[in-house]
Amino acid sequence: MIRLILVVLAVVLYLIFSIPVLSYLKNLEKKDPKAAAKKSLDLVRWILGIVRDLAGITYEVRGLEHIPSDRAVLYVGNHRSYFDIVMGYTTVPAPTGFIAKKEMIGIPLLSQWMVQMNCLFLDRSNIKEGLKTILTGIEKVK
């Protein structure tokens, strides 16, 4: 229970204190999108590393050397919990984006960070809109 409280506290404090950082990143994105993406990824990896450690997750990564670094890679996971995202961001070597359910847009600050990290929001109840999201994802991977 203490670990859960620490994780929630860390995430909430990060989201609150990162409000000015989000503004800075939005401005930087207009001038230098690659620098903004790198800084965003670094910050998200940092906080998710803290979340991972606070949660007491032990893990072993195998086969990282087989992931190509010269082209885009699509990872498809069997989503078991939100910790899939924590582990994905903290272990995968290249910039990573996730597809999230559309309802996540309604979570203040978190959704802004998700947009900043190139997450796409999938409307599972509307096949046409869902297909548009998938096609957008394909373009981003190219």
Give the positions of each predicted feature:
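A transmembrane-helix-recognition feature enriched in membrane-embedded lipid enzymes
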Residues: 1-61, 112-113
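Soluble catalytic domains of membrane acyltransferases
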Residues: 54-142
